[in-house]
From Swiss-Prot:
GO terms for biological process: translation. GO terms for molecular function: RNA binding; rRNA binding; structural constituent of ribosome. PROSITE patterns: RIBOSOMAL_S4E, S4. GO terms for cellular component: cytosolic small ribosomal subunit. Residues 42-105 form the S4 RNA-binding domain. It holds the Pfam family 40S_S4_C. This is Small ribosomal subunit protein eS4. InterPro entries: KOW, Rib_uL2_dom2, Ribosomal_eS4, Ribosomal_eS4_C, Ribosomal_eS4_central_region, Ribosomal_eS4_central_sf, Ribosomal_eS4_KOW, Ribosomal_eS4_N. PANTHER family: 30S/40S RIBOSOMAL PROTEIN S4 (PTHR11581), SMALL RIBOSOMAL SUBUNIT PROTEIN ES4 (PTHR11581:SF0). It comes from Yarrowia lipolytica (strain CLIB 122 / E 150) (Yeast). Keywords: Ribonucleoprotein, Ribosomal protein, RNA-binding, rRNA-binding. Belongs to the eukaryotic ribosomal protein eS4 family. It comes from the Eukaryota.
Length: 260
């Protein structure tokens, strides 16, 4: 009979977007409890060791973290399995580098470097808007933040721009047709486009129709859609490829053109 939380994760059961090889051991680092779900997060040890190659093993990652050199969303994190997730800003003090965790078109977290100005804020998708004790209104974002006294115009599925230094909302973007979005789940994960149409299904999943910069149309569930800007203007910089998924033939042609 299981008592308490699970503490281990077999390597083969780890999320595929962590891109761990099968033969380097039996176990994988298991994300701690935190702002993102295990299967939607990237532990700091994998980011520093496997992605950036700043450490050779877990012991070296711990040595880096214990010097309090790594910040996630402006807060020092010393837990090597802290779950960083979508839209989180990771800052490395010694190298002066800033990264934002966003998906590439293959559904993996891209190593996306950003400027100091962009590292000062993050976007949060509004999951819930409610009235709490003593009639105080509040909203909850996708990364577990509770923000009190929000603008009454902010509704569920809208996106808020959060200043990381104060934790306050500086602006927000409505979930509306014509706004630019990124897909955060499903087979179209990581693709970027503008909303063209929303199908409402009572008792089922609402479907959102999206058109990318090359006029390719695709659809996904409403829960997978994250608004990242108003109109065509994104509030964040996008990783290489700008969220445009090419077909296999288009990828081949692009490779050939590069070789020539």
């Amino acid at each position: 009979m299981a008592r308490g939380p699970k503490k281990h994760l077999k390597r083969l059961a780890a999320p595929s977007h962590w891109m761990l090889d099968k033969l380097s051991g039996t176990y994988a680092p298991r994300s701690s409890a935190g702002p993102h779900k295990l299967r939607e997060s990237l532990p700091l040890v994998i980011f520093l060791r496997n992605r950036l190659k700043y450490a050779l093993n877990g012991r070296e990652v711990n040595a880096i973290l214990m010097q309090r050199l790594v910040k996630v969303d402006g807060k020092v994190r010393t837990d090597s399995t802290f779950p960083a997730g979508f839209m989180d800003v990771i800052q490395l003090e010694k190298t002066g580098e800033n990264f934002r965790l966003v998906y590439d078109v293959k559904g993996r977290f891209a190593v996306h470097r950003i400027t100091d100005e962009e590292a000062a804020y993050k976007l949060g998708k509004v999951k819930r808007v409610q009235v709490g004790k003593k009639g105080i209104p509040y909203l909850v974002t996708h990364d577990g933040r509770t923000i009190r006294y929000p603008d009454p115009l902010i509704k569920v599925n809208d996106t808020v721009k959060i200043d990381l230094a104060t934790g306050k909302i500086t602006s927000f973007v409505k979930f509306e047709n014509g706004n630019i979005v990124m897909t955060t789940g499903g087979r179209n994960m990581g693709r970027v486009g503008t909303i063209t149409h929303r199908e409402r299904h009572e008792g089922g999943f609402d479907i959102v129709h999206i058109k990318d910069a090359l006029d390719n149309q695709f659809v996904t569930r409403l829960t997978n859609v994250f608004v990242i800007g108003e109109g065509n203007k994104s509030l964040i910089s996008l990783p290489k490829g700008k969220g445009i998924k090419l077909s296999i033939a288009e990828e081949r042609d692009a490779r050939r053109a590069k070789q020539e």
